[in-house]
């Protein structure tokens, strides 16, 4: 079994947080949605191209949320849910972010501020970014080719011809920290990454494949390493554009640890001891995964302590 320890508490993953109830029962209730939109307590998140306005305060980085009467009158509305106080939240997607008089507000995306936001704000932005991207790429029916229109408060697209309903796409992907008999960790690097950047291996689940099978297949395809038993650790949405990262810990089979990279997805792969990783990071020769990614948390489980801070990439 993997030498990566099991955790008693869920991992604190930056993009796997939320502070609202998605309240799916209201998505097709047009009178309720209209009343919620016009309520003075309702807050609206303008979004464009995966970015929203944020402001840096003494309490931290926060989303700029507008009362609905101050929000732009054009754009696509997505109902995001309600909080414990009954406040409703909507996203408003447009071609560009609206102009603002507040000079402190700045546009930012999830990669930049996802880990800095509160649980509520992180959940709102992840939800909004995922929906915005899906709507932008699914304007036509995959059955008949006719245009589709938004329905279900932004959570459905319905064909204007054949009435087929299409739902937001989520692509399951496995990401894994693999160890060997010497308790070394397998990390890889892609050719397009910054020099010195290393991370855990990952890949999409294929049709007709279990997630455990996907872990073993991806590791063998990318690095030539054969994997035995694996254990689920945690998951995190990764809306770049539509992935759900399923985190695992696994152990390489004895005699199956020789590395042969595929040369396509990975340019290099390597087994690291804790001492090697620590020395490489201290020398600036190894850059660990960014704090927003589940990869960083998987490596930290094996490493036994937080990794040093790293720049966004």
Model-derived features: positions:
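Active-site-adjacent beta-strand/loop module that shapes the phosphate/pyrophosphate-binding cleft
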Residues: 236-260
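Cys/His-rich short segments
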Residues: 127-179
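The catalytic Nudix box helix
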Residues: 199-233, 248, 254-256
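Conserved hydrophobic/aromatic beta-strand scaffold that supports enzyme active sites
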Residues: 79, 140, 175-177, 187, ...
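Short beta-strand micro-motifs in enzyme catalytic cores
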Residues: 76, 88, 155-157, 172-174, ...
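Active-site lining segments that contact anionic ligands and/or coordinate catalytic metals
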Residues: 227, 233-235, 243-247, 266-267, ...
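N-terminal strand-loop-strand
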Residues: 157-199, 204, 226-227, 250-252
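Nudix hydrolase/Nudix homology domain
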Residues: 1-138, 149, 193-198, 263-313
């Amino acid at each position: 079994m993997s030498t990566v320890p099991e955790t008693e508490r869920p991992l604190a993953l930056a993009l796997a947080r939320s502070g609202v109830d998605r309240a799916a029962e209201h998505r097709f209730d047009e009178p309720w949605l209209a009343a919620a939109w016009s309520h003075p307590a309702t807050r609206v998140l303008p979004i464009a191209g995966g970015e929203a306005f944020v402001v840096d305060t003494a309490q931290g980085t926060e989303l700029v949320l507008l009362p609905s009467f101050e929000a732009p009158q054009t754009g696509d509305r997505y109902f995001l849910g309600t909080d414990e106080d009954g406040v409703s939240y909507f996203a408003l997607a447009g071609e560009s972010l609206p102009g603002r008089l507040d000079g402190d507000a700045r546009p930012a995306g999830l990669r930049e501020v996802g880990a800095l936001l509160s649980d509520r704000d992180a959940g709102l932005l992840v939800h909004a970014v995922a929906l915005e991207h899906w709507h932008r790429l699914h304007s036509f029916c995959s059955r008949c080719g006719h245009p589709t229109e938004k329905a279900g408060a932004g959570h459905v697209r319905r064909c204007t011809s054949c009435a087929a309903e299409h739902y937001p796409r989520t692509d399951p992907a496995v990401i894994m920290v693999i160890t060997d008999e010497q308790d070394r960790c397998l990390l890889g690097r892609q050719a397009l990454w910054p020099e010195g950047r290393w991370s855990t291996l990952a890949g999409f689940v294929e049709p007709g494949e279990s997630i455990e099978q996907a872990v073993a297949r991806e590791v063998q395809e990318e690095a030539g390493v054969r994997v035995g038993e694996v254990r689920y650790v945690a998951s995190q949405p990764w809306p770049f554009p539509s992935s759900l990262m399923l985190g695992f810990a696994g152990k390489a089979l004895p005699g199956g640890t020789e590395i042969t990279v595929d040369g396509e997805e990975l340019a290099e792969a390597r087994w690291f001891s804790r001492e090697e990783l620590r020395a490489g990071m201290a020398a600036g020769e190894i850059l660990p995964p960014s704090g927003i990614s589940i990869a960083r948390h998987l490596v930290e489980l094996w490493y036994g302590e937080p990794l040093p801070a790293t720049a966004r990439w």
